């Protein structure tokens, strides 16, 4: 597993280098390889990253809404939108990442595809819509187009290629895992509901989250079930 994580870190680094190389080549081809254009390219790069971050988490949110999930927390960098008792609360805490936490309904089969793939589809749509920037026939909009598309492709691949980062599965890994069996889907849904309770520091009755589970020889298929047991054990 550590080997796989190392490979993915290398792949992510390659994506970043390719993005930078693409931008540099464009600046050079336009005879704009200057400190001024370079500085603005960095600003547009950060803007593109922010847009794709917002799009990715919003994609998860929309996928969750379509699937009947209930919002717990939607975070865009330092801004968090928390939904508690049908009331929205804004919180600010420094962060450069995003997160969308939602809890599913008590229905079978568990609806998970739209929620987990929503972020990837959102990044793809943003990358496609970025082609409209070429209509302006401007150096700066062309530069923004290149950055939006290159970052979008990187985001899609990083989230779609199944892998774990520090033991945490990405979207592609989660989708692959949930397709294996109904038991894993039940574990996943139960884990999200339990995590939602934990997020709000609400009282948790262990008996509501204890159920019979056939042990799988595949450790990954037991991932969410084991997470549930770890949380319940920590509450004792």
Task: Place the predicted regions along the sequence by residue.
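Topogenic membrane-insertion module of multi-pass membrane proteins
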Residues: 1-45
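Membrane-embedded alpha-helical segments that form the functional core of polytopic membrane enzymes
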Residues: 34-55, 142-157
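Small-residue-rich helix-interface/hinge motifs
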Residues: 43-105
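Hydrophobic transmembrane alpha-helical segments that form the core helix bundle
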Residues: 105-198
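Generic helix N-cap/helix-start motif at coil->alpha-helix transitions
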Residues: 186-189, 220-228
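"A position-specific structural signal for the A-helix of alpha-solenoid helical repeats
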Residues: 192, 228-229, 233
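Helix-turn-helix repeat elements of alpha-solenoid scaffolds
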Residues: 197-212, 236
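Solenoid-like repeat scaffolds
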Residues: 211-221
């Amino acid at each position: 597993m550590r080997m796989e994580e190392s490979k993915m870190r290398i792949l992510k680094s390659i994506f970043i280098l390719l993005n930078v190389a693409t931008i540099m080549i464009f600046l050079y081809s336009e005879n704009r390889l200057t400190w001024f254009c370079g500085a603005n390219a960095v600003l547009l790069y950060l803007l593109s990253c922010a847009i794709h971050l917002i799009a990715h988490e919003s994609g998860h949110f929309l996928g969750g809404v379509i699937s009947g999930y209930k919002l717990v927390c939607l975070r865009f960098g330092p801004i968090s939108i928390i939904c508690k008792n049908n009331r929205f609360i804004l919180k600010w805490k420094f962060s450069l990442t995003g997160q969308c936490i939602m809890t599913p309904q008590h229905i079978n089969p568990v609806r998970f595809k739209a929620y987990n793939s929503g972020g990837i589809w959102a990044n793809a749509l943003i990358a496609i819509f970025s082609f409209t920037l070429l209509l302006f026939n401007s150096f700066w909009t062309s530069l923004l187009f290149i950055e939006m598309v290159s970052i979008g492709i990187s985001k899609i691949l990083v989230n779609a290629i199944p892998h774990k980062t520090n033991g945490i599965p990405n979207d592609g890994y989660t989708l692959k895992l949930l397709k294996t069996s109904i038991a894993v889907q039940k574990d996943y849904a139960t884990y999200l509901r339990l995590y939602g309770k934990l997020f709000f520091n609400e009282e948790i009755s262990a008996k509501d989250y204890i159920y019979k589970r056939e042990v799988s020889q595949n450790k990954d298929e037991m991932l969410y079930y084991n997470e549930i047991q770890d949380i319940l054990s920590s509450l004792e």
